[in-house]
Amino acid sequence: MALITRAQQLCPKRNLTAILGDLGLPLATYYRWQQRAQSQQLADHIVIPSRTAVPPTPQEIDCVVQGAQRHLLLGYKRLAYALMAENKAFLRPWMVHDILDQYQLLGRRAPVPEPLVRPAAADHPDQRWHTDLSMWWFDDQWFWMIDILDAYSRYLVHCELLLTARTDAVERAVQRALDTLVGRARLAGEPQIVHDGGPQFIGHDWVQFMQAVGATDVRTHPYHPQSNGLDERVHRTFREEMPIGAEAILYEAQATMLEYRRYYNDRRPHSALRYLCPADYYRGNPVARLAEREAKLRAAALARAVYWQQEKDQAAKSLS
């Protein structure tokens, strides 16, 4: 505004529109600024008080460092919320980032950006399930793993290892997932079963099965794995984090997979769920969990302020 006023004083013969055109400023923006200036709401007139964050305590720093060394695949945000969920340290993600940077523990790979075209987001649990099969090699042969993922909560409703990928084996696995809904209210046509149109999902037997269980069959676009991107991403997570070696036998691999499923659902913070766990959204109260976490963060900040004030008072006392 001061620059415009000065230009009007130096060039009284030029009208306001010409001056604003030289500055590349729309006329509507100028009048909006003028109204805000009259009410003292321009940015250069607003005094924003500076606040200094209370630094973490040594105990909190040790907890973050040990957590980063123990969980090498967790990024700083997921690590921050995992420590909160375990009631070990209540630090903002940027504070965890600064600690990891200070101790040179930020060497985590950046994800490869990949545009995904997905169906409209689900707005309640069991509205839409994504399913797919992946192949695993161990015990000198190939096995198929089928997983069924709830789109709303990212909850792994069911997963198991199959000896064959025939339609009847897939139907039995889906039926086991549907059995978990016994006793719960289901809307007509739900859940919608989203798949990639593989040979297991296109035959007459599969269509009859979908009609019998009251679910809706949803086939994604051919040659477009991004349409089933939620489940494709889970497969990548399985490959990265589920420790099934080539020497494992079927019983051991099945036990490892079930244990990882419990960890994934109940303890692993999910970036798409504001770093809550899938179980919090699937059958829990995410609003209450977020409020509880925020309250713990505020309490931890107050405790840190008290800690450093005591350290300051003790240092002053030792000098006197």
Feature-to-residue mapping (PLM):
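Structured, charged N-terminal subsegments at the starts of enzyme catalytic cores
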Residues: 19-36
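RNase H-like DDE/DDD metal-dependent nuclease/strand-transfer catalytic core used by mobile genetic elements
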Residues: 89-93, 98-109, 116-145, 151-263
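Short, amphipathic alpha-helical "recognition" segments used to contact nucleic acids or chromatin
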Residues: 1-14, 61-70
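Short alpha-helical "recognition helix" segments of helix-turn-helix
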Residues: 15-22, 79
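Basic, flexible linker segments flanking DNA-binding modules
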Residues: 31-128, 225, 282-288
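C-terminal domain-tail junction helix/linker
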Residues: 50, 211-213, 237-320
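Alpha-helix C-capping/helix-to-loop hinge sites
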Residues: 7-10, 67, 86, 241-245
